[in-house]
Regions:
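Conserved, well-structured core segments that form or line functional sites
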Residues: 88-130
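Short glycine-/aliphatic-rich beta-strand segments at the starts of folded cytosolic domains
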Residues: 74-86
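A short, compositionally biased
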Residues: 32-36, 58-59, 101-102
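Intrinsically disordered, low-complexity, positively charged segments
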Residues: 1-50, 148
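Short, flexible, solvent-exposed loop/turn segments with mixed acidic/basic and small polar residues
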Residues: 37-40, 70-76, 102-107
């Protein structure tokens, strides 16, 4: 980085890719994507001040800043997750109920796999109740995968814009 200028972001750009731009990333943990204000350095050392618009959803790869020299994207770090793999909807429903009582967000990884961030007190209880159907694995918990009782908020925001 050539200067100590703070990059202040209060709206997200319309991406117009250029050929010779440097790629940079603002690294976030899964639980930071809903924060309204984020101040930290990017991987390349740029000081970023993100004042997130309330309607914006910070998902993996989202461009949050672009100029003629660089593009800054969101990078959500993978984390240790408790994963239930089951095609039995009753088991999936019970698991979601057990996890929902802890107010942890649930993520749909694929058709038969759901994940939540690791919780050291909850994992043994889930393993005891669901056996080998529950395991630990590393996943990127992206807001586009979150399950809500009224549908996926990310997908609803996309439909409203179209």
């Amino acid at each position: 980085m050539q200067n100590n200028e703070v990059i202040r972001i209060d709206s997200l750009p319309v991406v117009q890719p250029l050929n010779n731009q440097e790629e940079d990333s603002l690294v976030l943990e899964w639980y930071e994507v809903n924060r309204t204000i984020i101040k930290r350095k990017s991987l390349a050392g740029r000081m970023i001040h993100l004042d997130k618009p309330s309607s914006a959803v910070l998902k993996q790869g989202l461009v949050i800043y672009q100029d003629t020299k660089c593009v800054v994207r969101i990078f959500i770090k993978p984390c240790t997750c408790m994963v239930l793999q089951s095609s039995n909807m009753e088991v999936v429903g019970l698991f979601c109920f057990d996890v929902g009582n802890r107010h942890l967000p649930i993520y749909m990884i694929d058709d038969h796999k759901i994940a939540i961030a690791y919780d050291g007190r909850l994992f043994p209880a889930l393993q005891q109740k669901y056996g080998n159907a529950v395991s630990l694995a590393n996943y990127r918990l992206d807001p586009s995968q979150i399950i809500n009782c009224y549908g996926n908020i990310y997908e609803q925001n996309i439909k409203k814009k179209n």
